[in-house]
């Protein structure tokens, strides 16, 4: 079990909890443990809920669980929250020595998590899936009867992963992004998204955003991104259509991933800008600058893009059981985007489809309105409210005993 040090500008209080400078811990505050590490798709919803919890109850105590190999070792301390590390428990996908080591790894991680729950006097565990969620779910229900910690599960994907299927069996409440993710008794709340995105006014920020990236005020802007590492098929298709897009007067903002490069033709005199960057530090400005996006359809991507009312061409990652396609379906069926399979995303498709959307003001306006209506900008607050309700009820029951 490892504690993560606090970054510069923050300080630890006597209880070992990292908090923003000047904010003190109250031992009387509700103690919430957030279990959602590994990838940004698990961490970002947890951090959005952490922010919402703090806004609803300034005395709340928040502890995030993670592993040393997850992105949480960087993202959680950056957001000013305390992180505890436990043993990584990946599920082997084929018969190997790791499969035989799995029971001992699970047991070790559960013991570590149980100790953390005791140390922080946890009132509720909120799990978001991923490798750290299963030990958290098992530890919460394996504590002594009078100290068992209630569990709230949040499933961001349209098809639940195995971790949340385990957690849902004993959870007090099961929250989800869609009505039927394969879990029982779900309450649809959407995917928690950080407040900086849900409060974004694209039109109010548009002039600043376009100036930031070097686009004209009246430009028609296509945003292309494939997650933090980019997406090769998106890169090839859009870069391959660069000349045709330029002929139609379309500007492009393309985040291609830090490990990737783009094969772009030399710009001709008078061509609109094709801005290629490895990574977008300011997604708020990128969303505000854009009229249309071409992107993957991970749960967080769909949640953010729809929350800001940005129409999109969703290209599901062609792996797994089709979860990304299911993630995009509600927005697409509402009219806020279109869906194209990865193998069908070609330069020819981009050159024909994107100008057809960006050059039709009525279609684009209708898609923008539909995308905004399909989003759930209050999801983080709703998850936080449920967590506090469950925690307070559990604390009251313990007090009466």
Curated annotation (Swiss-Prot):
One term under GO cellular component: plasma membrane
Pathway per the UniProt entry: Cell wall biogenesis; peptidoglycan biosynthesis
GO molecular function: UDP-N-acetyl-D-glucosamine:N-acetylmuramoyl-L-alanyl-D-glutamyl-meso-2,6-diaminopimelyl-D-alanyl-D-alanine-diphosphoundecaprenol 4-beta-N-acetylglucosaminlytransferase activity; undecaprenyldiphospho-muramoylpentapeptide beta-N-acetylglucosaminyltransferase activity
EC number(s) on file: 2.4.1.227
Record carries keyword Glycosyltransferase: yes
InterPro entries documented for this protein: GlcNAc_MurG (IPR006009), Glyco_trans_28_C (IPR007235), GlycoTrans_28_N (IPR004276)
Keyword field contains Cell membrane: yes
GO biological process: carbohydrate metabolic process; cell division; cell wall organization; lipid glycosylation; peptidoglycan biosynthetic process; regulation of cell shape
Membrane topology type: Peripheral membrane protein
Region (Disordered): 1-24
Record key words, sorted: Cell cycle, Cell division, Cell membrane, Cell shape, Cell wall biogenesis/degradation, Glycosyltransferase, Membrane, Peptidoglycan synthesis, Transferase
Catalytic activity reported: di-trans,octa-cis-undecaprenyl diphospho-N-acetyl-alpha-D-muramoyl-L-alanyl-D-glutamyl-meso-2,6-diaminopimeloyl-D-alanyl-D-alanine + UDP-N-acetyl-alpha-D-glucosamine = di-trans,octa-cis-undecaprenyl diphospho-[N-acetyl-alpha-D-glucosaminyl-(1->4)]-N-acetyl-alpha-D-muramoyl-L-alanyl-D-glutamyl-meso-2,6-diaminopimeloyl-D-alanyl-D-alanine + UDP + H(+)
Binding site for UDP-N-acetyl-alpha-D-glucosamine: 39-41, 157, 194, 228, 324
Subcellular locations according to the entry: Cell membrane
Summary of the function given for this chain in its UniProt record: Cell wall formation. Catalyzes the transfer of a GlcNAc subunit on undecaprenyl-pyrophosphoryl-MurNAc-pentapeptide (lipid intermediate I) to form undecaprenyl-pyrophosphoryl-MurNAc-(pentapeptide)GlcNAc (lipid intermediate II).
PANTHER family: GLYCOSYLTRANSFERASE, UDP-N-ACETYLGLUCOSAMINE--N-ACETYLMURAMYL-(PENTAPEPTIDE) PYROPHOSPHORYL-UNDECAPRENOL N-ACETYLGLUCOSAMINE TRANSFERASE 1
Similarity comment: family membership: Belongs to the glycosyltransferase 28 family. MurG subfamily.
Protein name per UniProt: UDP-N-acetylglucosamine--N-acetylmuramyl-(pentapeptide) pyrophosphoryl-undecaprenol N-acetylglucosamine transferase
